[in-house]
Curated annotation (Swiss-Prot):
Xref: InterPro entries: Aldolase_TIM (IPR013785), His_biosynth (IPR006062), HisA_bact_arch (IPR006063), Isoase_HisA-like (IPR044524), Isoase_HisA-like_bact (IPR023016), RibuloseP-bd_barrel (IPR011060)
Pathway(s): Amino-acid biosynthesis; L-histidine biosynthesis; L-histidine from 5-phospho-alpha-D-ribose 1-diphosphate: step 4/9
UniProt xrefs under Pfam families: His_biosynth (PF00977)
Identification of the protein by name: 1-(5-phosphoribosyl)-5-[(5-phosphoribosylamino)methylideneamino] imidazole-4-carboxamide isomerase
Main location: cytoplasm
A Gene Ontology BP annotation from the UniProt entry: L-histidine biosynthetic process
EC class name: isomerase
Residues at the catalytic site: 8, 131
SUPFAM superfamilies (alphabetical): Ribulose-phoshate binding barrel
Enzyme Commission number: 5.3.1.16
Length: 244
């Protein structure tokens, strides 16, 4: 399982939210580019960059900064999300150097757009974000809870051809209280590869996630920024069987 550091952008700074609450944001750096280079120097293979302002507004607003981050780490693959709700937004991010683009709200509200994105850009370059609060889907920057279970959304997008989902338990995001292993396992059992997010607070949490069949990667934010988990070599960023 690959560990992916998170770089969440809000008003040009690197922040972390607590349980998806924009009113409870902690600023970890005023220089996201320096932060990206820090993780790259430590051997990270991937970065996960989120435009939080874009997620709230429904369209990416930090394109230029994101492209600068991508250019600053040429040897690292960068996955980008936040407010990606049109084909033009997907294309611009990919042209700007993103290795993968994450589609969230639009995957539920605009399935035809998702289908076209998969056809035009390829299933390996499109990831669907499924964010949940107590099992219910959270959309529009995690501020709206929909009357649909997260498993149903995954089932729908699998039928459209999606192969990889980014699953976040918003109630655990930024809490360091252990990932929702049961949720990740249930979603992986639906026939997708899972990138897990939310709740990682220690290396033992990562080892537990690595044992869940179908979990390919884990996104880690606060635990890295506060030094609860430390990685200094490329091999440190791989947990479990793949490290052999």
């Amino acid at each position: 399982m690959i560990v992916i550091p998170a770089i969440d952008l809000r008003e040009g700074r690197c922040v972390r939210l607590f349980r998806g609450d924009f009113a409870r944001a902690t600023v970890y750096s005023d220089d996201p580019i320096e932060m990206a280079q820090r993780w790259a120097s430590a051997g990270a293979r991937w970065l996960h960059v989120v435009d939080l302002d874009g997620a709230r507004l429904g369209q990416p607003v930090q394109h230029e900064l994101i492209e600068r981050v991508i250019r600053a780490v040429p040897d690292v693959a960068v996955q980008v999300g936040g407010g990606v709700r049109t084909l033009d937004a997907v294309e611009r991010l990919l042209v700007g150097g993103a290795a993968r683009v994450v589609i969230g709200t639009a995957a539920l509200e605009r399935p035809d757009m998702l289908r076209e994105a998969l056809a035009r850009f390829g299933v390996e370059r499109v990831v669907v974000a499924v964010d949940s609060r107590d099992g219910w889907v959270a959309t529009h920057g995690w501020e709206t809870v929909q009357a649909i279970r997260v498993e149903e959304v995954v089932h729908r997008v699998v039928l459209l051809g999606v192969r990889r989902v980014l699953a976040t338990d918003v109630t655990r995001d930024g809490t360091l209280t252990r990932p929702n292993l049961e949720l990740m396992g249930r979603l992986a059992a639906l026939g997708v590869t899972v990138i897990a997010s939310g709740g990682v607070g220690s290396r033992s949490d990562l080892e537990a996630l690595a044992r869940v069949p179908g979990v390919e990667a884990a996104i880690v934010g606060r635990a890295l920024y506060e030094g609860r988990v430390r990685f200094e070599r490329p091999e440190d960023w791989v947990i479990g069987a793949e490290a052999a």
